[in-house]
Amino acid sequence: MALVDKHKVKRQRLDRICEGIRPQIMNGPLHPRPLVALLDGRDCTVEMPILKDLATVAFCDAQSTQEIHEKVLNEAVGAMMYHTITLTREDLEKFKALRVIVRIGSGYDNVDIKAAGELGIAVCNIPSAAVEETADSTVCHILNLYRRNTWLYQALREGTRVQSVEQIREVASGAARIRGETLGLIGFGRTGQAVAVRAKAFGFSVIFYDPYLQDGIERSLGVQRVYTLQDLLYQSDCVSLHCNLNEHNHHLINDFTIKQMRQGAFLVNAARGGLVDEKALAQALKEGRIRGAALDVHESEPFSFAQGPLKDAPNLICTPHTAWYSEQASLEMREAAATEIRRAITGRIPESLRNCVNKEFFVTSTPWSVIDQQAIHPELNGATYRYPPGIVGVAPGGLPPAMEGIIPGGIPVTHNLPTVAHPSQAPSPNQPTKHGDNREHPNEQ
């Protein structure tokens, strides 16, 4: 009776340790086809040809996990998503088999990547997605603020008569020359650099602030680097945001930083809505401290002028988070996302993934020393294997690759293969010994 209780305690201890470990995606003739889901869309025509030979692809068209089908929550091993759905820790815990999420785009602030990593879910993005489109849209917004094209168009649509010089002065009030103006870029990654190249062609002097970037890039692009945000805000006639959103830079543009900007400067944001405190921006626009602003992203999306702090703000251009979009960019992003899912299925997570953003939080296995070896299936315990318990390591002549994976809780594997033959005696003295071989019996010191 005492022996039974002892084994029961060991089993419970192993179950607790392995509770957070998710298996690698099982792929092959001995396993059912893995399920991959597009969470917040309904068109899978691009993804299907890339994945159809090894996975079942489904769509959910959901805006929250409450709208996701139960089969996807229980069985999906891979998920693709745009920016229109948010996954918190609570949401991620609802997925029972999920191993990889690919964000179809560059930003991933709508996924709790730390919680995902701790749950054994890799999160990937497409960092080169729509760089040209976003840069082009940003420059369009900048030109619009300087040349007032949007307001001139609106005046004509409203029936304003523009004929005399006085009428032109009135309707085009605020239009400014670009040459010699200073454009300040906060964040100087792919998109920031693309904006700099375009802006220089229009006559801007370009400066940037990016505390994470190594020195030297400014020389190759002929721009100037500043080393504090305050310096950038003070020197810039137009400020454009090109950084990811995180807990450190939320509301980077707020009442305090706006007061450090030049009187009458412009502000452009095609990065993330949470970077700008919209209440502070609205007040600055009304007071004229900021001459004009152009926003493609907003704190609350989908954006509406009918509500929120910006509804009465003057000199404001807003677009509905579309700076990234072109037919070509959309196609490339979807192909890249499906290809990353394919890497996850055919390779190992996260090692095989090209753009995993949460490796530092990732939990893949438990150290050997904390798991009782006797709970491991006998065939997988012995001289041939030395891997963390629960992970089936494949040695020459052992299990086929299709059987490689994690066995939660040490559940026995059922297969028709012969058992692994272990040496019954020590090797011959004449047999060479490989130094550093890690495959000795785990109990041997």
From Swiss-Prot:
Biological process according to GO: cellular response to leukemia inhibitory factor; negative regulation of DNA-templated transcription; positive regulation of retinoic acid receptor signaling pathway; positive regulation of transcription by RNA polymerase II; regulation of transcription by RNA polymerase II; synaptic vesicle docking; white fat cell differentiation
Compartments reported by the entry: Nucleus; Synapse
Basic and acidic residues: bias regions: 434-445
Asymmetric dimethylarginine: modified positions: R22
Region Disordered: start-end pairs: 414-445
Record's keyword annotation contains Oxidoreductase: yes
Binding site for NAD(+): 106, 186-191, 210, 243-249, 270-272, 296, 321-324
Post-translational modification: Phosphorylation by HIPK2 on Ser-428 induces proteasomal degradation.
Gene Ontology molecular function: any one: transcription corepressor activity
Residue positions of the active site: R272, E301, H321 (proton donor)
UniProt KW keywords: Differentiation, Methylation, NAD, Nucleus, Oxidoreductase, Phosphoprotein, Repressor, Synapse, Transcription, Transcription regulation
UniProt cross-references to Pfam families, sorted A to Z: 2-Hacid_dh, 2-Hacid_dh_C
GO CC entries: GABA-ergic synapse; glutamatergic synapse; nucleus; photoreceptor ribbon synapse; presynaptic active zone cytoplasmic component; presynaptic cytosol; ribbon synapse; synapse
Assembly: Interacts with HIPK2, ZNF217 and PNN. Interacts with the transcription factors BKLF, delta EF1/AREB6/ZEB, EVI-1 and Friend of GATA (FOG) via the consensus motif P-X-[DNS]-L-[STVA]. Can form a complex with BKLF on a CACCC-box oligonucleotide. Can form homodimers or heterodimers of CTBP1 and CTBP2. Interacts with NRIP1 and WIZ. Interacts with PRDM16; represses white adipose tissue (WAT)-specific genes expression. Interacts with MCRIP1.
Similarity comment text for this entry: Belongs to the D-isomer specific 2-hydroxyacid dehydrogenase family.
Name of the molecule in the record: C-terminal-binding protein 2
Organism: Rattus norvegicus (Rat)
